Amino acid sequence: MSMQSNSSDASSATVDPAEIAKFSRLSAQWWDPTGKMAPLHKINPLRLSFIRDAACRKFERNAKSLNCLSGLRMIDIGCGAGLLCEPFTRLGAQVIGVDPSATNIAAAKLHAEKSQLLIDYRCTTVEQMDPRERFDIVLAMEVIEHVTDVGAFLARCAAITKPGGLMVVATLNRNWKSFALAIVGAEYVMRWLPRGTHQWDKFVTPDELTKHLHNNKLAVTEQAGLVYNPLADKWSLSADMDVNYMVVAETAAG
Protein backbone atom coordinates (compact mmCIF):
# COMPACT_ATOMS: atom_id res chain seq x y z
CA MET A 1 0.00 0.00 0.00
CA SER A 2 1.53 3.26 -0.98
CA MET A 3 1.04 6.11 -3.07
CA GLN A 4 2.49 15.24 -2.90
CA SER A 5 5.85 13.18 -3.87
CA ASN A 6 9.14 15.00 -3.44
CA SER A 7 10.06 14.15 -7.01
CA SER A 8 8.65 15.79 -10.11
CA ASP A 9 9.45 12.55 -11.95
CA ALA A 10 6.58 10.82 -10.20
CA SER A 11 3.73 12.41 -12.14
CA SER A 12 1.50 10.12 -14.20
CA ALA A 13 -1.99 9.72 -15.54
CA THR A 14 -3.35 7.44 -12.81
CA VAL A 15 -1.47 8.63 -9.70
CA ASP A 16 -3.50 10.77 -7.31
CA PRO A 17 -1.26 13.51 -5.76
CA ALA A 18 -3.40 13.59 -2.61
CA GLU A 19 -2.80 9.87 -2.11
CA ILE A 20 0.97 10.28 -2.55
CA ALA A 21 1.02 13.05 0.07
CA LYS A 22 -1.00 10.95 2.49
CA PHE A 23 1.41 8.01 2.43
CA SER A 24 4.50 10.22 2.36
CA ARG A 25 3.47 11.53 5.77
CA LEU A 26 3.41 7.96 7.04
CA SER A 27 6.71 6.89 5.49
CA ALA A 28 8.85 7.34 8.61
CA GLN A 29 6.58 4.91 10.46
CA TRP A 30 6.52 2.10 7.89
CA TRP A 31 8.90 -0.22 9.74
CA ASP A 32 7.45 0.27 13.23
CA PRO A 33 5.34 -2.87 13.88
CA THR A 34 3.55 -1.15 16.76
CA GLY A 35 2.99 2.21 15.04
CA LYS A 36 0.42 3.46 12.58
CA MET A 37 1.36 0.79 10.05
CA ALA A 38 0.81 -2.02 12.57
CA PRO A 39 -2.19 -3.43 10.64
CA LEU A 40 0.02 -3.88 7.59
CA HIS A 41 2.68 -5.66 9.65
CA LYS A 42 0.03 -8.02 11.02
CA ILE A 43 -1.36 -8.88 7.61
CA ASN A 44 2.02 -9.00 5.86
CA PRO A 45 2.97 -12.64 6.67
CA LEU A 46 -0.33 -13.80 5.19
CA ARG A 47 0.19 -11.77 2.01
CA LEU A 48 3.75 -13.05 1.74
CA SER A 49 2.84 -16.73 2.06
CA PHE A 50 -0.12 -16.39 -0.34
CA ILE A 51 2.06 -14.82 -3.04
CA ARG A 52 4.96 -17.20 -2.44
CA ASP A 53 2.75 -20.27 -2.67
CA ALA A 54 1.00 -19.03 -5.82
CA ALA A 55 4.35 -18.31 -7.45
CA CYS A 56 5.77 -21.69 -6.48
CA ARG A 57 2.76 -23.49 -7.91
CA LYS A 58 2.99 -21.53 -11.14
CA PHE A 59 6.74 -21.85 -11.61
CA GLU A 60 7.00 -25.35 -10.11
CA ARG A 61 9.16 -24.45 -7.14
CA ASN A 62 9.40 -25.90 -3.64
CA ALA A 63 7.78 -23.34 -1.34
CA LYS A 64 9.77 -24.69 1.59
CA SER A 65 13.08 -23.87 -0.10
CA LEU A 66 14.87 -20.82 1.30
CA ASN A 67 15.53 -19.54 -2.23
CA CYS A 68 12.31 -20.75 -3.85
CA LEU A 69 11.98 -17.63 -6.01
CA SER A 70 15.56 -17.63 -7.29
CA GLY A 71 15.84 -16.45 -10.89
CA LEU A 72 12.40 -14.84 -10.95
CA ARG A 73 12.03 -11.14 -11.66
CA MET A 74 9.45 -9.40 -9.47
CA ILE A 75 8.12 -5.86 -9.23
CA ASP A 76 6.14 -4.42 -6.31
CA ILE A 77 4.14 -1.44 -7.57
CA GLY A 78 3.38 1.03 -4.81
CA CYS A 79 5.98 -0.67 -2.62
CA GLY A 80 5.94 1.86 0.22
CA ALA A 81 9.01 1.29 2.37
CA GLY A 82 9.55 -2.26 1.13
CA LEU A 83 7.62 -4.49 3.53
CA LEU A 84 7.15 -7.07 0.77
CA CYS A 85 10.29 -6.34 -1.25
CA GLU A 86 12.65 -7.38 1.54
CA PRO A 87 11.22 -10.85 2.31
CA PHE A 88 10.89 -11.69 -1.38
CA THR A 89 14.50 -10.66 -1.93
CA ARG A 90 15.47 -13.06 0.86
CA LEU A 91 13.59 -15.80 -1.01
CA GLY A 92 15.84 -15.26 -4.00
CA ALA A 93 13.75 -13.05 -6.28
CA GLN A 94 15.28 -10.16 -8.19
CA VAL A 95 13.04 -7.41 -6.82
CA ILE A 96 12.27 -3.94 -8.10
CA GLY A 97 10.16 -1.70 -5.88
CA VAL A 98 8.52 1.39 -7.36
CA ASP A 99 6.63 4.13 -5.57
CA PRO A 100 5.79 7.72 -6.56
CA SER A 101 6.66 9.00 -3.08
CA ALA A 102 10.32 9.97 -2.74
CA THR A 103 10.08 9.79 1.04
CA ASN A 104 8.79 6.21 0.91
CA ILE A 105 11.61 5.22 -1.43
CA ALA A 106 14.16 6.91 0.83
CA ALA A 107 12.81 4.95 3.81
CA ALA A 108 12.90 1.73 1.77
CA LYS A 109 16.50 2.27 0.63
CA LEU A 110 17.66 3.08 4.15
CA HIS A 111 16.08 -0.04 5.63
CA ALA A 112 17.39 -2.29 2.85
CA GLU A 113 20.89 -0.93 3.39
CA LYS A 114 20.65 -1.62 7.12
CA SER A 115 19.41 -5.12 6.30
CA GLN A 116 22.23 -5.63 3.77
CA LEU A 117 19.79 -6.40 0.98
CA LEU A 118 20.23 -5.41 -2.66
CA ILE A 119 16.88 -4.11 -3.92
CA ASP A 120 16.31 -1.85 -6.92
CA TYR A 121 14.08 0.90 -5.53
CA ARG A 122 12.83 3.58 -7.92
CA CYS A 123 10.84 6.73 -7.30
CA THR A 124 8.60 6.45 -10.31
CA THR A 125 5.27 5.07 -11.50
CA VAL A 126 4.46 2.00 -13.53
CA GLU A 127 3.36 4.27 -16.39
CA GLN A 128 6.79 5.89 -16.55
CA MET A 129 8.81 2.70 -16.60
CA ASP A 130 10.59 1.51 -19.72
CA PRO A 131 7.83 -0.29 -21.66
CA ARG A 132 10.35 -2.96 -22.65
CA GLU A 133 10.79 -4.15 -19.07
CA ARG A 134 9.07 -7.43 -18.22
CA PHE A 135 8.53 -9.32 -14.96
CA ASP A 136 7.64 -12.87 -13.98
CA ILE A 137 5.61 -11.58 -11.02
CA VAL A 138 3.83 -8.21 -10.79
CA LEU A 139 2.42 -7.14 -7.42
CA ALA A 140 -0.19 -4.42 -6.91
CA MET A 141 -1.01 -4.77 -3.24
CA GLU A 142 -3.54 -2.35 -1.75
CA VAL A 143 -2.84 0.10 -4.57
CA ILE A 144 -5.75 0.12 -7.02
CA GLU A 145 -8.10 1.72 -4.49
CA HIS A 146 -5.76 4.73 -4.50
CA VAL A 147 -5.38 5.35 -8.25
CA THR A 148 -7.50 7.62 -10.45
CA ASP A 149 -8.15 5.12 -13.25
CA VAL A 150 -8.18 1.45 -12.30
CA GLY A 151 -8.50 0.22 -15.88
CA ALA A 152 -5.56 2.26 -17.17
CA PHE A 153 -3.42 1.28 -14.19
CA LEU A 154 -4.07 -2.45 -14.59
CA ALA A 155 -3.49 -2.22 -18.34
CA ARG A 156 0.00 -0.88 -17.66
CA CYS A 157 0.63 -3.58 -15.06
CA ALA A 158 -0.46 -6.22 -17.55
CA ALA A 159 1.88 -4.78 -20.20
CA ILE A 160 4.96 -5.42 -18.04
CA THR A 161 3.94 -8.95 -17.06
CA LYS A 162 5.87 -11.59 -19.00
CA PRO A 163 3.98 -14.14 -21.10
CA GLY A 164 3.20 -16.95 -18.68
CA GLY A 165 3.72 -14.58 -15.76
CA LEU A 166 1.68 -13.76 -12.67
CA MET A 167 -0.05 -10.64 -11.43
CA VAL A 168 -1.24 -10.50 -7.82
CA VAL A 169 -3.68 -7.79 -6.79
CA ALA A 170 -4.93 -7.06 -3.27
CA THR A 171 -7.66 -4.53 -2.61
CA LEU A 172 -10.94 -3.85 -0.80
CA ASN A 173 -14.43 -4.84 -1.90
CA ARG A 174 -17.09 -2.13 -2.19
CA ASN A 175 -20.20 -2.85 -0.13
CA TRP A 176 -21.75 -1.79 3.17
CA LYS A 177 -19.76 -4.38 5.10
CA SER A 178 -16.46 -2.99 3.82
CA PHE A 179 -17.62 0.53 4.65
CA ALA A 180 -18.49 -0.54 8.19
CA LEU A 181 -15.28 -2.51 8.81
CA ALA A 182 -12.57 -0.93 6.63
CA ILE A 183 -13.54 2.70 7.15
CA VAL A 184 -15.76 3.15 10.21
CA GLY A 185 -14.15 0.30 12.15
CA ALA A 186 -10.50 0.59 11.08
CA GLU A 187 -10.24 4.39 10.86
CA TYR A 188 -12.73 5.71 13.43
CA VAL A 189 -13.36 3.00 16.04
CA MET A 190 -10.14 0.97 16.24
CA ARG A 191 -8.02 3.84 14.86
CA TRP A 192 -5.73 1.37 13.12
CA LEU A 193 -5.39 3.80 10.23
CA PRO A 194 -5.47 7.61 10.03
CA ARG A 195 -8.90 8.95 9.14
CA GLY A 196 -9.18 9.45 5.41
CA THR A 197 -6.75 6.67 4.49
CA HIS A 198 -9.41 5.12 2.27
CA GLN A 199 -12.29 6.38 0.15
CA TRP A 200 -15.11 3.85 -0.02
CA ASP A 201 -16.17 4.85 -3.53
CA LYS A 202 -12.69 3.90 -4.77
CA PHE A 203 -12.99 0.32 -3.53
CA VAL A 204 -13.20 -2.30 -6.29
CA THR A 205 -15.49 -5.32 -6.35
CA PRO A 206 -14.10 -8.75 -7.34
CA ASP A 207 -16.31 -8.75 -10.44
CA GLU A 208 -14.98 -5.35 -11.51
CA LEU A 209 -11.41 -6.45 -10.94
CA THR A 210 -11.91 -9.71 -12.85
CA LYS A 211 -13.39 -7.78 -15.77
CA HIS A 212 -10.43 -5.38 -15.87
CA LEU A 213 -8.00 -8.31 -15.80
CA HIS A 214 -9.91 -10.18 -18.50
CA ASN A 215 -9.87 -7.07 -20.69
CA ASN A 216 -6.08 -7.19 -20.46
CA LYS A 217 -5.89 -10.90 -21.35
CA LEU A 218 -5.25 -12.07 -17.80
CA ALA A 219 -7.07 -15.11 -16.44
CA VAL A 220 -7.91 -15.24 -12.73
CA THR A 221 -6.59 -18.51 -11.28
CA GLU A 222 -6.87 -17.95 -7.52
CA GLN A 223 -8.67 -15.64 -5.15
CA ALA A 224 -9.03 -15.42 -1.41
CA GLY A 225 -10.43 -13.16 1.24
CA LEU A 226 -8.53 -11.96 4.29
CA VAL A 227 -10.51 -11.96 7.51
CA TYR A 228 -9.54 -10.48 10.87
CA ASN A 229 -10.36 -12.22 14.15
CA PRO A 230 -10.36 -9.53 16.86
CA LEU A 231 -10.33 -12.07 19.70
CA ALA A 232 -7.16 -13.73 18.42
CA ASP A 233 -5.79 -10.50 16.92
CA LYS A 234 -5.00 -12.51 13.81
CA TRP A 235 -5.64 -12.46 10.08
CA SER A 236 -6.46 -15.60 8.09
CA LEU A 237 -7.32 -16.58 4.52
CA SER A 238 -11.01 -17.18 3.88
CA ALA A 239 -13.58 -17.67 1.15
CA ASP A 240 -15.16 -14.47 2.50
CA MET A 241 -14.15 -11.70 0.07
CA ASP A 242 -16.59 -9.11 1.41
CA VAL A 243 -13.84 -6.77 2.66
CA ASN A 244 -10.14 -7.49 2.02
CA TYR A 245 -9.29 -9.86 -0.80
CA MET A 246 -6.46 -10.96 -3.11
CA VAL A 247 -6.55 -12.19 -6.69
CA VAL A 248 -3.94 -14.08 -8.71
CA ALA A 249 -4.08 -13.80 -12.49
CA GLU A 250 -1.92 -15.31 -15.23
CA THR A 251 -0.95 -14.14 -18.67
CA ALA A 252 -1.00 -16.62 -21.53
CA ALA A 253 2.30 -18.33 -22.25
CA GLY A 254 4.16 -16.85 -25.20
From Swiss-Prot:
Keyword Methyltransferase among UniProt keywords: yes
Reaction catalysed by this enzyme: a 3-demethylubiquinol + S-adenosyl-L-methionine = a ubiquinol + S-adenosyl-L-homocysteine + H(+); a 3-(all-trans-polyprenyl)benzene-1,2-diol + S-adenosyl-L-methionine = a 2-methoxy-6-(all-trans-polyprenyl)phenol + S-adenosyl-L-homocysteine + H(+)
Classification via SUPFAM superfamilies: S-adenosyl-L-methionine-dependent methyltransferases (SSF53335)
Signal peptide: none
TM annotation in the entry: none
Family note: Belongs to the methyltransferase superfamily. UbiG/COQ3 family.
Protein's job: O-methyltransferase that catalyzes the 2 O-methylation steps in the ubiquinone biosynthetic pathway.
Protein's name in the database: Ubiquinone biosynthesis O-methyltransferase
Native source species: Rhodopseudomonas palustris (strain BisB18)
